[in-house]
Regions:
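Short alpha-helical DNA-recognition segment
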Residues: 13-31
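DNA major-groove recognition helix of helix-turn-helix/homeodomain DNA-binding modules
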Residues: 43-59
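Helix-turn-helix DNA-binding elements, focusing on the entry/boundary residues of the two helices
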Residues: 5, 16, 27, 42-45
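A short, Lys/Arg-rich alpha-helix, primarily the initiator
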Residues: 1-12, 22, 58-59
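Short, functionally important structural connectors and interaction interfaces within domains
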Residues: 6, 25, 52-53
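Short acidic/histidine-centered micro-motifs embedded in hydrophobic/aromatic stretches
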Residues: 63
Length: 63
């Protein structure tokens, strides 16, 4: 099953604002990543993986 960032966030029951805070970024930047208007930076992905260790990064960001 394909899981994207929105699906992942919804599965852990977080708002965009809560997710942005967890990964240490702004709501604006996070929202643009979800909408496909920005690509996640390496720094963003490192922070994401540190907070969500069990997340399948390939499935979320590269499928």
């Amino acid at each position: 099953m394909k899981v994207n960032l929105v699906d992942f966030r919804n599965s852990i029951k977080l708002t965009q604002k809560e997710m942005a805070e967890k990964v240490g970024t702004t709501l604006s930047y996070y929202s643009k990543i979800e909408l496909g208007l920005r690509n996640p930076s390496y720094n963003f992905m490192e922070k994401f993986k540190a907070k969500f260790v069990d997340a399948n990064m390939d499935e979320i960001f590269f499928s």
